[in-house]
From Swiss-Prot:
GO terms for cellular component: cytosolic large ribosomal subunit. It comes from the Bacteria. The gene is rpmI. GO terms for molecular function: structural constituent of ribosome. Disulfide bonds: none annotated. It comes from Prochlorococcus marinus (strain MIT 9313). This is Large ribosomal subunit protein bL35. The lineage of its organism: Bacteria, Bacillati, Cyanobacteriota, Cyanophyceae, Synechococcales. Keywords: Ribonucleoprotein, Ribosomal protein. Belongs to the bacterial ribosomal protein bL35 family.
């Protein structure tokens, strides 16, 4: 059976944890940050867990993660 290809776009955006979940960056922290509070920007800087409903799609895109 041939090797499965990894979706490179997904590989740059998601990282797998030891428990098999996937971590992602949060949205809304790219630009237009002047009016956002420091507390909000700190919160947006943290990683988030991919929702379980989307995790299966991410797993298919990253077969070796």
């Amino acid at each position: 059976m041939p090797k499965l290809k990894t979706r490179k776009a997904a590989a740059k955006r998601f990282k797998a944890t030891v428990t098999g979940k996937f971590m992602r960056r949060r949205a809304f922290r790219n630009h237009l940050l002047d009016h956002k509070s420091p507390k909000l920007k700190r919160h947006l800087a943290t990683k988030a867990v991919v929702d379980e409903r989307d995790a299966e799609n991410v797993r298919l895109m990253l077969p070796y993660a």
